[in-house]
Amino acid sequence: MIAIYPGRFDPVTLGHLSVARRASGFCDRLIIAVFDNPAKPGLFTAAERVDFIKQSIKDFPNVEVRSFSGLMVNFARKMGASLIIRGLRVGADFEREMEMYVMNRRLDEGIELCCLFSEPQYQYLSASLIKEIVILGGDSSGLISEHVAVALKNKLASV
């Protein structure tokens, strides 16, 4: 089975990587799909985000990383995927994922959704919160990979 784990990953967190690691255990191939939305650019380019994830998943043998734009179900179809993986942190995530599930099912009934609860230490972790912590001079260790932390500090210093 081929699964897609989509997201912005701006930047990728240890919570994201935890979901990817767990999902890779029950699918033959997992594609981490970095959403590239030109209308809403992030702090990092899609290419930078793909590179950060590639550096972080070297030990995940059945996981690959690609960027995509447009509808996620179209990308999933193109990749031959039948499952979308999403991580759930807090209650608001459930509501958003339910909305997306209903719309994705309307667009393609052949693609299922699997939501994985975040591990407790990552329940309130978000890319936005990471950026705020770093901007305010806080310690991001244990929240993002070291190579991502260095790139984030450098990027924020130049903004």
UniProtKB/Swiss-Prot annotation:
Return the SUPFAM superfamilies for the record. Nucleotidylyl transferase (SSF52374)
Q: Report disulfide bridges, numbered on this chain.
A: none
Q: Which UniProt keywords apply?
A: ATP-binding, Coenzyme A biosynthesis, Cytoplasm, Magnesium, Nucleotide-binding, Nucleotidyltransferase, Transferase
Annotated binding of ATP, by residue: H16, G87, L88, R89, E97, Y122, Q123, Y124, L125, S126, A127, S128
Q: Which EC main class describes this enzyme?
A: transferase
State the EC number(s).
2.7.7.3
Q: Look up the record and report any one GO term of the cellular component aspect.
A: cytoplasm
Q: Name one Pfam family in it.
A: CTP_transf_like
> Which residues are tagged with the site Transition state stabilizer?
H16
Report which reactions are catalysed by this protein. (R)-4'-phosphopantetheine + ATP + H(+) = 3'-dephospho-CoA + diphosphate
Instruction: Give the pathway annotation.
Output: Cofactor biosynthesis; coenzyme A biosynthesis; CoA from (R)-pantothenate: step 4/5
Kindly give the InterPro entries that the UniProt entry links to this protein. Answer: Cyt_trans-like (IPR004821), PPAT (IPR001980), Rossmann-like_a/b/a_fold (IPR014729)
User: One biological process GO term for this chain?
Assistant: coenzyme A biosynthetic process
- Top-level taxon in the UniProt lineage: Bacteria
User: Where is the protein situated, by its record's location annotation?
Assistant: Cytoplasm
Record CDD domains = PPAT (cd02163)
Q: Please provide, alphabetically and separated by semicolons, the GO molecular function terms listed in this UniProt record.
A: ATP binding; pantetheine-phosphate adenylyltransferase activity
Q: Which positions bind substrate?
A: K40, M72, R86
Cofactor requirement: Mg(2+)
Entry's family note: Belongs to the bacterial CoaD family.
Describe, as the record does, how this protein assembles with itself and its partners.
Homohexamer.
Q: What does this protein do?
A: Reversibly transfers an adenylyl group from ATP to 4'-phosphopantetheine, yielding dephospho-CoA (dPCoA) and pyrophosphate.
> Mind telling me which NCBIfam families this protein's record contains?
coaD_prev_kdtB (TIGR01510), cyt_tran_rel (TIGR00125)
Q: What is this protein called?
A: Phosphopantetheine adenylyltransferase
Origin organism of this chain? Dehalococcoides mccartyi (strain CBDB1)
